Amino acid sequence: MLKELRQKRPLVHNITNYVAAQFVANGLLALGASPLMSDAIDEMRDLAKISDALAINIGTLNDRAILCAKEAIKHYKALNKPIVLDPVGCSASALRHDTSLELLKSGGISALRGNAAELGSLVGISCESKGLDSNDAATPVEIIKLAAQKYSVIAVMTGKTDYVSDGKKVLSITGGSEYLALITGAGCLHAAACASFLSLKKDPLDSMAQLCALYKQAAFNAQKKVLENNGSNGSFLFYFLDALSLPIELENSLIKEEW
């Protein structure tokens, strides 16, 4: 699938946060896609015509970003092109939560990507940012399956173990590196990468599982370089971009059916 992505070089339109925009663009280029970064409301119609997919990230949310996301969804939905929503921090504020719900209820979202706290928030299950509440009986498998069913999307939950679901089947993906949690933009790039894989028009559940596995394997490969060279967070960032640009063999990442 990665080989096909690099042959096609899909154009991925990103409405993302300004903290991570450069990293997202460079990451997509490394992976083999072409980034387009725009949040100009008046050009959403035109960009939807030429782009292969849309990734929306609400990391630096404001009134203008909300209007832009709504306008973009309208046009991408009309053209039946994949849309990925990354509801960053939607468990942290009413504005983020309500905006995420409004965008989801538009009916145009193809994939919903977030961590356990974010996805749990959107299905009414309270989670801590670092995992599920000890008093909450719901498991990641139950949360992601419910999210996929409730919003008719492919749900992608990232963490130490990733999970993907279409509402019926749930797959888990292990592997990766702890360094992913120590750099800004790893999740933002992951959402954009999800959009790039969905643009290939393959089975969406399998596409998301493959993307998660490749992403974790690239992180693992980058971590090996960091350890070999006595590096840390900064060097991991650059080694990770390098790893994304190289052939990626799934040696450390494992896809398993959970449900």
Swiss-Prot record:
ATP binds at residues 113, 158. The keyword Nucleotide-binding applies. Pathway: Cofactor biosynthesis; thiamine diphosphate biosynthesis; 4-methyl-5-(2-phosphoethyl)-thiazole from 5-(2-hydroxyethyl)-4-methylthiazole: step 1/1. Pfam families: HK (PF02110). It is an enzyme of class 2 (transferase). Keywords: ATP-binding, Kinase, Magnesium, Metal-binding, Nucleotide-binding, Thiamine biosynthesis, Transferase. InterPro entries: Hyethyz_kinase (IPR000417), Ribokinase-like (IPR029056). The keyword Mitochondrion does not apply. One of its GO terms (biological process) is thiamine diphosphate biosynthetic process. One of its GO terms (molecular function) is magnesium ion binding. Disulfide bonds: none annotated. Its EC number is 2.7.1.50. It catalyses: 5-(2-hydroxyethyl)-4-methylthiazole + ATP = 4-methyl-5-(2-phosphooxyethyl)-thiazole + ADP + H(+). Substrate binds at residues 37, 185. Its cofactor is Mg(2+). Catalyzes the phosphorylation of the hydroxyl group of 4-methyl-5-beta-hydroxyethylthiazole (THZ). Belongs to the Thz kinase family. NCBIfam families: PRK09355.1, thiM. This is Hydroxyethylthiazole kinase. It comes from Helicobacter pylori (strain ATCC 700392 / 26695) (Campylobacter pylori).
